[in-house]
Amino acid sequence: LIHFYNIKNKLFLSDLPGYGYAKAPKSKRFEWIKLMEGYFKNRSNLSRVFILIDARRGIKNSDHELMDLLNIIAVNFQCILTKIDKISSTALREVTASTLSQTEKYAASFPEILQSSSNKKIGIDKIHECLNLILNINNISKKE
């Protein structure tokens, strides 16, 4: 199941909820991976995939599976640590460093780890800046 969001006909977001849900049977997770692979391969206008990672948990095996897939099919991705208000500043520094060290091996990985908290509205402006930058880059390349 993929949820689609159209934002002012300028930005189209797709949400793949549950791909990392650990309690799902392996057969279901395999179906999700195949669905995602087909979706990502057939999207020529796909600029970047944002992988949301719970800062309390860090990168899970399912996240690595997704990163491997995106790297193989050459789709850029960037990690966003979520729920950063639920951990200490020391733990946040550690999970950020760990996430960066785990993702830098992927050629398709964007080298900046974003941080956010929807409850405290932390990092939302930075995510908006990132999306605006992507939109501006795409608009420039379409004009050329």
Listing of model-derived features with the role each one plays in the protein:
Residues 86-144:
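Canonical P-loop GTPase G-domain recognition
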Residues 6, 51, 114:
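Conserved beta-strand segments that form the floor/walls of ligand-binding pockets within enzyme
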Residues 11, 18-21, 56-58, 83-88, ...:
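Conserved nucleotide-binding/hydrolysis micro-motifs of P-loop NTPases
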Residues 1-28, 133-144:
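Conserved G1/Walker A P-loop phosphate-binding module
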